[in-house]
């Protein structure tokens, strides 16, 4: 549970979490818009919005017009409320390409794209920056995490050694060449 992970006894009043799966796709986006407006004025700002499953806001990730409309609306809301909107979108199976027109549009507008992948060490996963608008993704540390049975959750395991970072730079350059 979120509170246990954050080592907090109680949920702060400002933290809101909603399950929108019982709504139609159009109602989901409207609920996000309305709640952002409400909570912006109620709390004097919004620190972060997380949409876990942005593909659930559209009928088809391959519908260009619908994808552009949803991303434009989220981009507009981020600007109006001066906040970060973090969107989760899965890659196509066995690839590093985001799904459909939705993925393409999200890549175009995103300030940062992070990827969570299996590490060479099979019990760990690694978080990699694929895009950083004001910098190089190669300058962002590779963060490791793994399932901890005792804690009952994934835990941070540190950064990959500097040598790994240098190997990544070399691999990226070879792939570009």
What are these regions (language model features)?
Residues 48, 56, 65-155:
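Phosphate-binding/switch region of NTP-binding enzymes
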Residues 31, 134-177:
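Conserved alpha/beta core segments of nucleic-acid transaction machinery
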Residues 1-62, 149-150, 160-161:
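Conserved inter-motif catalytic segment of the P-loop NTP-binding fold
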Residues 1-3, 17, 106, 172-177:
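Generic low-polarity alpha-helical segments
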Residues 21-25, 99, 166-169:
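Alpha-helix initiation/capping motif
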């Amino acid at each position: 549970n979120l509170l246990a992970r954050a080592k907090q006894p109680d949920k702060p009043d400002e933290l809101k979490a909603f399950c929108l799966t019982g709504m139609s796709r159009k109602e989901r986006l409207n609920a996000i818009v309305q709640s952002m407006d409400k909570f912006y004025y109620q709390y004097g700002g919004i620190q972060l919005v997380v949409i876990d499953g942005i593909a659930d806001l559209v009928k088809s990730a391959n519908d260009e017009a619908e994808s552009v409309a949803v991303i434009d609306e989220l981009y507009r809301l981020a600007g109006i409320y001066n906040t970060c909107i973090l969107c989760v979108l899965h890659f196509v199976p066995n690839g590093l390409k985001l799904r459909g027109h939705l993925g393409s549009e999200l890549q175009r507008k995103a300030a940062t794209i992070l990827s969570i992948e299996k590490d060479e060490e099979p019990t760990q996963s690694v978080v990699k920056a694929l895009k950083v608008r004001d910098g190089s993704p190669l300058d962002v540390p590779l963060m490791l995490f793994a399932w901890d049975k005792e804690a009952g959750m994934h835990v941070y395991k540190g950064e990959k050694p500097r040598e790994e970072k240098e190997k990544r730079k070399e691999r990226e350059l070879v792939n570009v060449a």
